[in-house]
Amino acid sequence: AMAAAAAAMCRLDEHLDLTKRGGRVVCVGLGSGALPAFMARKFPTAVVEVCEIDPVVAEAVRGFHGLNPPKLLGPWGDKPVPGNLPPGVGLCMGDAGEFMEKAARAVERGDAPLASVVFLDAFDGAGEVPSHLTSKDFLEKCDRVLAPGGCVVINLFNGPAGSVQRRRLETIAANLEAVVGAVTTFPVEFPVNVVLAARKERADGFGDQEDPRFTRKELKSAGREISKELQFEWDAGHFLKKAYWVETEGGASFKERPAGLSLNPLSGFVNRMGTAMSDEWAREQEQEM
């Protein structure tokens, strides 16, 4: 869902279409290597930079997904410059906060291009996204690297309404909205995860587009179009057809509504919609553990 959301959102912005303009993709967290490898394989003119702090993870990924060996970069000093890389995957071992700060400075000096997408798919030993990577301070660094109209895409653990996981997700959504721009959520096949995507505002707005967020219809169509064109192994539109627009009112609340659909806000049906994990699904998971 992360790759699907990013590919479709960039496709819908003529200035950032990865199929036509190459571009720069930054991945915070290597994980299994599947995400950066997929982006590099399907968008061969794009520069895909990965920041990973754990050498064990990096070593485990070598030999998989065509990342054998990845281009090793850093540790970052003033040079080499983040962003000044040939197409393909480059790996930087080190702290993500330091990496993003130096990447932002490089952009501001004019030594590196802006990024079309920043992916955040990093988890600690306890299976949680480190809190400093979802703070306003870190997201501001991401925003400094991001091109206008570009997106920050985050993979998070989900939970039932009112759960610790869900409250944290709501806080992160509020931070994203405050720092980067309008937020859209995407459910995944199994509700244990949810994807958040924030689109950066443009200084001059978005022209004739009344809302900077994309509708379900637009996302689904763009996803299916790009999947067919680039021969994805799966239908990106399938992952995007249940997108939700998020409204946080500055962190005072958290509401999801079907992206681009007009529904009666007083309807009880609206309150049952969204990406929150159902209580029944959560109970089933607990019983299996």
Tell what function each PLM region has.
Residues 1-179, 191, 289:
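The AdoMet/dcAdoMet-binding core of the Class I SAM-like
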Residues 123, 188, 201:
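Flexible loop residues that form catalytic
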